[in-house]
Amino acid sequence: MEARRHSALKDSIRSIPDYPKPGIIFRDITTLLSDPRSFRRAVDSLVHPYAGGRIDQVAGIEARGFILGGAVAHQLSSGFVPIRKKGKLPHKTVSTAYALEYGTDEIEIHVDAIKPGDRVILVDDLIATGGTATAAVNLLRQLGAEVIAACFVIDLPEIGGAQRLRDLGVTVRTLMEFEGH
């Protein structure tokens, strides 16, 4: 049943070759999000391992992590914490820089978004290099969170981001893998 469910979810992802540049296959989850059944299945699958447990906050990475993370937080009766690009949050923040293919970027979180000891799940749509997710985990831990897991709809395993998180002691849960990027 679970394998069939994830196969149907994988079929709901649109693959766009040569976007945003030649040689890249963009995995577009907007088709999954626009289909009520697929969206429900994805959220239910992300929630299932944590239902009935104590999850204080779900942290979502801008922007698609907001959509998925908000739905997961709702189902778990948890709070939701947005992790945004630097300069987008109005209150006092803590931030961290991380490496991109060419250069660096920075993400931030409100300093009062997490209480020490909060049990947190990190959610985003896709993990590739793991740079943003690693930075997010570091921010959450800096504020005293216990990062229970990092959850993604899609993993691009050959790029190694999920393993990078595992090497930091983070449990990684993904719903599907795509080869090629």
UniProtKB/Swiss-Prot annotation:
UniProt-listed Gene3D superfamilies: 3.40.50.2020
This protein's GO CC annotations: cytoplasm
Keywords: Cytoplasm, Glycosyltransferase, Purine salvage, Transferase
EC number: 2.4.2.7
Involved pathway(s): Purine metabolism; AMP biosynthesis via salvage pathway; AMP from adenine: step 1/1
Predominant place of localization: cytoplasm
GO BP: adenine salvage; AMP salvage; purine ribonucleoside salvage
Family matches, as Pfam families: Pribosyltran
Subcellular location per the Swiss-Prot or TrEMBL entry: Cytoplasm
Gene Ontology terms for molecular function: adenine binding; adenine phosphoribosyltransferase activity; AMP binding
Reactions that this protein is recorded to catalyse: AMP + diphosphate = 5-phospho-alpha-D-ribose 1-diphosphate + adenine
Family: Belongs to the purine/pyrimidine phosphoribosyltransferase family.
HAMAP family named in the record: Aden_phosphoribosyltr
Assembly behavior: Homodimer.
Functional note: Catalyzes a salvage reaction resulting in the formation of AMP, that is energically less costly than de novo synthesis.
Protein name as catalogued: Adenine phosphoribosyltransferase
Organism from which the protein derives: Methylorubrum populi (strain ATCC BAA-705 / NCIMB 13946 / BJ001) (Methylobacterium populi)
Top-level taxonomy: Bacteria, Pseudomonadati, Pseudomonadota, Alphaproteobacteria, Hyphomicrobiales
